[in-house]
């Protein structure tokens, strides 16, 4: 399990040292804010239903783009062969990469927790619906990350892996 933990830390570190991470987080939070404001202003009720539904569709397109580099870049840079010849079990490599991507999804969703707070300040939202909505979004993220990792394992090109992942999820 320590090997999976090391891969998890490496993947997170690799993601957050690039400016792409912060652009990705910013775009996601802007989309979430737009969906939240449109959902509340159009329906006039204290509900996150529209935001969560639109975020799940947005994540369907964004998460394969996030996971497209996991295996494809490792193959292109030659580190995949190094990993396969090292005493690293395949399950540990997959688990580390999957948990790192899922941790990024959790970070994305933590950024949207401001919106239920706004609803609670101005209204009386149904917390059971909000919690199950977030749980459903987390489970959808888990499935989307799995599909993205699978598509990344099929090809050496990250862009092709991203396209395969999106098509697979559609």
Task: For the regions a language model picked out, list residue spans one by one.
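Aromatic- and glycine-rich beta-strand/loop motifs that create alpha-glucan
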Residues: 1-21
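Hydrophobic alpha-helical transmembrane segments of multi-pass membrane transport/permease proteins
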Residues: 19-38, 54-63, 170
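Secretory targeting signals
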Residues: 35-37, 58, 100-161
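Short, hydrophobic transmembrane alpha-helix segments
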Residues: 37-47
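Transmembrane helix boundary and interhelical loop/hinge segments in multi-pass membrane proteins
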Residues: 48, 66-84, 98
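Long, hydrophobic alpha-helical segments
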Residues: 53-73, 108
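Hydrophobic alpha-helical membrane-insertion segments
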Residues: 164-170
């Amino acid at each position: 399990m320590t090997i999976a933990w090391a891969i998890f830390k490496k993947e997170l570190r690799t993601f957050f040292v690039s400016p792409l991470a912060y652009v990705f987080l910013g775009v996601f939070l802007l989309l979430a804010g737009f969906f939240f404001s449109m959902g509340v202003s159009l329906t006039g009720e204290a509900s996150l239903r529209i935001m969560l539904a639109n975020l799940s569709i947005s994540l369907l397109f964004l998460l394969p783009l996030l996971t497209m580099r996991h295996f494809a870049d490792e193959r292109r840079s030659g580190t995949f062969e190094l990993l396969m010849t090292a005493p690293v079990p395949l399950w540990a490599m997959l688990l580390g990469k999957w948990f790192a991507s899922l941790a990024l999804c959790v970070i994305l969703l933590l950024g949207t927790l401001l919106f239920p707070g706004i609803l609670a300040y101005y209204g009386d939202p149904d917390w059971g619906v909000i919690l199950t909505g977030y749980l459903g979004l987390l489970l959808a993220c888990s499935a989307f990350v799995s599909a993205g990792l699978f598509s990344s394992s099929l090809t050496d090109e990250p862009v092709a892996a991203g396209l395969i992942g999106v098509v697979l999820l559609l």
